[in-house]
């Protein structure tokens, strides 16, 4: 008889589940726009069944996408178990925009999808295929819970997209479904687990102190983070036009900026693309505040921005003060540059170039890692997350990826 399988969620992931409410969501979403390519039909739509066939063929490579939640009896802690009754039709769905669907109509549809809570009784993801977009294109909106999206074996986009325009259609294989424990078995396994942490803790402590240099670096890093956090707690964020309580509704919009223009700004002011984006954002926010008939000199705006470390596997949320009160664009750039240079000097950070230089595009996973760092933004009012785009054309079995956008969960 096969051994039962389950995986206990980390305390951090369990917190994401507990923090959700009728107004607060803990999932991220990606919007991808493709040319119809080989999926185009004579009626002007897309061949949804062919897309379904491709996704279904890739699922055996992504066991995480078949995992659903269970609760440990009495304890209540969530665990992952394989869904014995997994049905792709509950996760891959088809809809249509009124032709020719505009960007604005796509954003309204994405807003409704982002506002809807994922079904806790099933694996925590879904994907919408929207046909009817102007130019004969179609869109995919992939929504995934933060407790799932960062895990290995859950990056659906990395599996679906390829640099090979003529990639062959994968053949579907039978997925391995591992037996889930009964409530009694799950409770028994957790009782055993609770008796073993003391032995594991001793082993971790011995490994930690066997490397004094590593121990010193970790202690210094924790001390820096504590001091920084205390500093911001002493001086909390002031009032801003973005203060207020969350509603159950969402409104999503897209503003495109040519990357070449951003690069020119970066070359002029120095620093990184991220610095240039912050400079552009600060100027735009100053004009926005002025449009509300509010003096920018009275506004204290801070952005919480996740910074990926050099491995690209973890991120910390840093608070950047956006000097909207400063009228001079050059001075705003200098003030922002001082902050970002200090951050980079204190931590080994990943560059956008290094994160995007691999053979596969992992934007969805990097986006999820960054979103996880945005637990709460009480020290700021805005979130700014940089996730590099693909450095080469990507295709969904011949359909070219033309545009991609991310949706972060709102925090209060």
Please report, for each region that a protein language model flagged, where it lies by residue.
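Soluble acyl-CoA-dependent acyltransferase catalytic core bearing the H(X)4D motif
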Residues: 1-13, 31-46, 50-412
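Acidic, low-complexity proline/glycine-rich segments
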Residues: 11-23
